[in-house]
Amino acid sequence: MRTPAAVAALMMATVYVPVARAGPDDYVATPGVEYGEREIELRFGTASKSGDDRESAGSIAFGYGVTPSWFTEIYGKFNRAGSNATRFDALEWENKFQLSEPGEYFVDMGLLVEIEWPHDRAEGYELRIGPLFQKDFGLVQTNFNFLLERHFRSDEREVTELGYQWQVKYRWRPEFEFGAQGFGDVGPWNDWDAAREQSHTLGPAVFGKLPLGGRQVLKYNAALLFKASRAAPDRTFRMQLEYEF
């Protein structure tokens, strides 16, 4: 899995894996894996759009670095629409594979594979898969990922959709870094929606890592995203906390 040919084969395979719009608590995945790391993660996001109910979502997860190149995580996901009560939404199993060592190639590469079992069985189950890329320019870190998503055994027509996520950050200090993030969905991977129907958001973001002693670290990142297309929410606030030990 450490050669460009193998990485390219995995990337091409994602095109043939038989997405929904990015949720307000979605995050930008990075390709690195820490062997032996244990993690408790909290995510939250809320999005508003004129004429629609506010949508909020959150999750709690436990993850573990099983090998130097494989990190696995189990999520319990919750959501709330408008004034309705918060409800359990889904169980998700996420796996991240580091495909190259930092600096081994022009870009660092990884692969994300997620399987989700929605509480509403009419939604079937969901698979999301795609390559992760990172490139550093001195103190500036850039990430770009494109992800394919599809529901199986659902009551709705099954379509493979294409989404993306990106971020740029300046590593000013470990405890405080700043930059920008963006998320988007273009519709079916082989027949994109009209521009007015696509969802694109972007906005400023902050990041940081606070040492707690020993191997214990508290990481955070948060972003305030604004619509960059007609179909996107007007504003989205998202945040992520990770306690690593």
Predicted feature descriptions by range:
Residues 1-28:
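Cleavable N-terminal export/targeting peptides
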Residues 21-245:
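Transmembrane beta-barrel domains of Gram-negative outer membranes and organellar outer membranes
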